Regions:
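Conserved phosphate-coupling serine/threonine residues in phosphotransfer and NTP-handling enzymes
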Residues: 13, 112-114
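Short, well-ordered alpha-helix to beta-strand connector turns
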Residues: 3, 105-106, 132-133
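Structural motif corresponding to alpha-helix initiation and N-cap regions
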Residues: 38-41, 92, 96, 143-146, ...
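Substrate-recognition "cap/lid" segment bordering the active-site pocket of phosphatases
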Residues: 109, 116-162, 168-171
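N-terminal helical cap/lid subdomain that shapes the substrate entry/recognition surface
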Residues: 3-10, 14-93
Length: 171
């Protein structure tokens, strides 16, 4: 089937940001005197693909819910800054070239379980600004990936699409 639009996941599909995300979290945790929490790329591996509140529930389970989510929000702010400032290339080989080719015949979109600002960072860091028609994330909708995809489809009047992701939870 020929699809009019293609919707992409970010983490594990377009890039691998786990190491930089872990660094960003640790910067914030150390700043707050919480160095006993040492987040690694391996710590994040089974958590990527989940919504941010679920990640906070796992990483910071010993905090009361309100404090846990506030800490997670601060970690995500630091993560976004760290990703933005770090010159490291974390995109998978050939992603930009592939997306440029696909954009010639399809409208391309991004959907993520991430916080606001993360899709924009991905688009910018990978040089995809001219390729991506639009994006939505958990931070925009506060809901599941499936519902976020549906919201994106409605917003951009998408009638025929394929979703490309890397985990079963993406589908």
């Amino acid at each position: 089937m020929n699809y009019e639009s293609l919707i992409f996941d970010i983490d594990g599909t377009l890039w691998d940001s786990r190491a930089l995300v872990a660094e960003g979290y640790n910067i914030q945790l150390n700043k707050e005197g919480l160095s006993r929490y040492c987040i690694t790329a391996e710590t994040l591996k089974p958590l990527f693909g989940r919504v941010m509140t679920e990640i906070a529930d796992v990483l910071f389970a010993d905090f009361p819910e309100k404090e846990r989510y506030a800490l997670m929000a601060r970690c995500m702010e630091t993560e976004n800054r760290h990703l933005h400032e770090n010159p490291c290339h974390i995109g998978y080989p050939g992603v930009r070239e592939t997306m440029e080719e696909l954009a010639k015949t399809h409208r391309l979109f991004i959907v993520s379980n991430s916080q606001q600002g993360y899709p924009e960072l991905c688009i910018s860091k990978l040089g995809l600004t001219g390729c991506i028609t639009g994006h939505l994330c958990f931070g925009d909708t506060g809901t599941s990936k499936g519902k976020t995809i549906r919201a994106l489809m409605e917003k951009y009047h998408i009638t025929s699409c394929a979703y490309i992701g890397d985990t079963q939870g993406d589908y």
